[in-house]
């Protein structure tokens, strides 16, 4: 079961190695950052979740932060470029090919927060390192974090036990078995679940075409320039972590 899920995630992520652990995407992102990221770092800012990556980095990184719209103006070399593929706090998707091209131009590796994009968006293979969780676009139970990376990279051997990628890679502690089991049940149905998200997304874009962003639309969620109010007590609205004049809706459970 675990091998089947791991191989499936390798295919979705376009990565050679996938390490699972109990915990959230936040844990996976911080562990990935401490296992691989060092030196000069360029952080591409798009909202709350991209900006939060600064707090997850090793303290000795030399950090430069740029707005996504200013990416073309960045010059010089870096060791790493960091971004959130789908910034759920504002329902914005970066053009990952453009970010990868800038990373190549800067002679840098690419680190991607794929929490809101894995299982839904394409081109994850462009990342050198990425991290995400078992829910959202993988449609599994919450509770598993994943770090995925290319085989030509070697994680640092940190002087900690639990907070150490090699500990989880070598299965030296209890794994996220419940979440892995849920993902095993998703594999054959993932395309069905994804299509429901696509259908919901297209419906919203068509219905509210005058108040949605023209580009950079993620499948996971949509920003509407207006206030959304529930018409049923059973509806749970998404509360974004960014201060917005409009509303963000997510396309699950349709």
Across the structure, where does each feature detected by a protein language model lie?
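Conserved N-terminal alpha-helix of the aminotransferase class I/II PLP-enzyme fold
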Residues: 1-31, 35, 56, 197-208
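PLP-dependent aminotransferase-like
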Residues: 27, 34-79
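Active-site phosphate-binding strand-loop segment of PLP-dependent enzymes
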Residues: 69-119
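Short, conserved charged micro-motifs
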Residues: 71-75, 194, 226-231
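Conserved active-site segment immediately N-terminal to the catalytic lysine
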Residues: 124-135
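Active-site C-terminal subdomain of aminotransferase-like
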Residues: 135-206
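Conserved C-terminal alpha-helix-loop-beta "cap" of PLP-dependent enzymes
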Residues: 213-254
């Amino acid at each position: 079961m675990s091998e089947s899920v791991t191989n499936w995630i390798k295919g979705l992520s376009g990565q050679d190695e996938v390490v699972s652990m109990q915990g959230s995407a936040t844990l996976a992102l911080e562990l990935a950052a401490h296992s691989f990221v060092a030196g000069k770092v360029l952080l591409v800012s798009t909202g709350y979740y991209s900006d939060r990556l600064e707090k997850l980095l090793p303290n000795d990184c030399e950090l430069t932060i740029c707005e996504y719209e200013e990416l073309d103006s960045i010059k010089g070399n870096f060791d790493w470029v960091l971004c959130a593929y789908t910034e759920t706090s504002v329902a914005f998707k970066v053009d990952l090919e453009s970010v990868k091209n800038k990373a190549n131009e800067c002679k840098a590796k690419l680190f991607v927060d794929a929490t809101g994009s894995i299982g839904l968006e394409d081109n994850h293979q462009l990342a050198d390192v990425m991290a995400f969780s078992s829910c959202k676009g993988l449609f599994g139970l919450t509770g598993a974090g994943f770090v995925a990376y290319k085989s030509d990279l070697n994680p640092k051997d940190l002087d900690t036990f639990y907070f150490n990628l090699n500990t989880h890679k070598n299965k030296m502690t209890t794994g996220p078995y419940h979440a892995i089991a849920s993902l095993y049940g998703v594999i054959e149905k993932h395309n069905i679940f994804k299509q429901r998200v696509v259908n919901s997304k297209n419906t919203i874009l068509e219905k509210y075409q005058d108040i949605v962003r023209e580009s950079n639309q993620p499948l996971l969620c949509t920003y509407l320039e207006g206030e959304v109010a529930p018409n049923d007590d059973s509806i749970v609205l998404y509360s974004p972590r960014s201060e917005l004049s409009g509303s963000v809706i997510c396309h699950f459970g349709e």
